[in-house]
Amino acid sequence: MALANEEDMEAFFSDVVRYRPQELNQLASVTKFSRREIQHIYRGFKQECPLGTVDEDRFKHLFSQFFPFGDATKYAQFVFGTFCPPGTNIINFEEFLSSLSLVARGSLHDKIAWIFSLYDINHDGFITKHEMTEVVSAIYELLGHAIEPVLDAGSVERHVNAVFDLIDTNGDGVITLDEMERWCTRDEGNTKSLDMLNTVW
């Protein structure tokens, strides 16, 4: 039997490792996106991630294209952590779509839970002041020159202290999901801020 040429081998291995997503109807039934929206999202995903999966480095690169005036690396890492299943370092299309659906089209509780998971960096069920500082610093880095006046470490610390003390109602030094949910839903302004996720994503 003759050996396959190099192009045939590349095509074979490409087919072997390429991830195949679920059927369109199935994806539409488990997310809050229409079939047309899923097709549109998949086209963009496949163009940027032709193998059907994305690792953290690739995710950071893609994310940074939306924020050219700042450094999106750290914030993208935190977002990736909320999308990526525990113990893995890769996202397939279903996982990406499910997370996107939750953030963009989920209930108010879904959105609050996602925000909580973003700040709960070590996933222990609590947000510490250190974790909040890490994420807020990443947001400032992400926005870069768009922030005026330019903020320093002292600004970040003051911002975190003010917000943390508002949410940590029992003063035990950590924020729980319940405290986060109570704070986010206590007035209309906070709720409207969460509704902006519908258009941001």
What are these regions (language model features)?
Residues 34-36:
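N-terminal low-complexity tails and the immediately adjacent first alpha-helix
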Residues 115-138:
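A contiguous pocket-lining binding segment that forms or flanks enzyme active sites
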Residues 136-157:
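Strongly charged, low-complexity linkers/loops
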Residues 61, 66-67, 98, 104, ...:
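Conserved beta-strand elements of beta-rich interaction domains across eukaryotes
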Residues 11, 25, 157, 171-201:
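C-terminal interaction modules of eukaryotic adaptor/scaffold proteins
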Residues 1-28, 32:
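Cytosolic, low-complexity regulatory segments enriched in Ser/Pro/Gly with interspersed Lys/Arg
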Residues 53-57, 136-139:
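HEAT-repeat alpha-solenoid elements in large eukaryotic scaffold proteins
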Residues 38-56, 62-67, 73-101, 109-123, ...:
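Primarily EF-hand calcium-binding motifs
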